[in-house]
Amino acid sequence: FDSLASLSVGNGEFAFTVDATGLQTFPSMYSKGVPLGTQSQWGWHSFANPQGYKSEEVLKAFDFGRGHEELYACQFKEEGRQKEASDWFRVNPHRLHLGIVGLGLSDGVKASDITDIRQTLNMWKGEITSHFTLNGNAFDVQTVCHPDQDMISASVTSRAHAGVNLRFPYPTGAHADDACNWDANDKHSTTIVRQDAQSAVLKRVLDETTYYVTLRWEGKANLAEKSKNYFVLT
């Protein structure tokens, strides 16, 4: 596993980045490299603004010799409301990580347990092909993104059983990290709003932001909540 060698599929409006398993099974290993993101052009979020900061509070007048003063948004450094307002606008809005989708391997499995890794990205087809071995069982994974919709599809072939883990983070608001705050479960929620034998719809609520995630699968499987904002498909 190379934290700088993650691969992505996307369509210009949506992108999904994977590790060597073809999904986002070990995201923490990539958090300091090229993170395993699921992001879209529409997926933005703002933290709560209980102080009611307004954009005009961060404007400052400058005279550039054009016969009139011009207003520009600035980062204020002096302590006080203007600094607090500029700090808030500096991180809001920010792009959302829409969710981690990883293989549900046996408990205790580490990345170092995975061997015989072979992975390629066919840029012409927009397909990631991943092969690896775990506990003597070979896994072959094909990962693609729909050309026109915010949708990914993965095919997993193996004699061993592997489910799918879905974890949803709260955003960090930072500019150079993996966009995942895993220590703020009280600030967002994920609920199953519809489920049948081969599909489910999840509702995500983060402050004033709401979006939905649709899941579809082939064969017999069950989606269940493992813990808050964490679901498993087995």
Regions of interest found by a model, annotated:
Residues 1-234:
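Beta-sandwich/jelly-roll carbohydrate-recognition scaffolds of carbohydrate-active enzymes
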